[in-house]
Amino acid sequence: NTALMPDPAMFEISQRFYFDAAHTLQREIEAQGSKRVHGHTYHAEVFVQGQPGDNGMVMDLGLVRQALKEVREQLDHHYLDEVPGLGPATLENLCLFIWRALQPQLPGLSAVQVERHSIGDKCVYRP
């Protein structure tokens, strides 16, 4: 019930998804292993901000999951160097790629985060 919400109520919901992918990367440091084809399990999370509607939700998380499924299919078990529109497979470019794919479908999209837990790397994109 939105009558229980403080005014103005601003919330941020999130949904995670995972994908496994391979890539190469041209780097100045730790270059040898990066130049070879290698893979990671990526953990991504998207955030949607807004005020709850009459249904008490910022957005139905089922709609978020549906949009994520389409993006995940473009990345999961793919060679990222060949994904159109991605560019070099950096965490920064992955965040931007996911943002651009989701932004038209998810009004209120406020951030995209991509992590590689195995090596402790993370990037957050907040325009």
Residue ranges and their predicted role:
Residues 3-127:
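Charge-rich, low-complexity N-terminal segments
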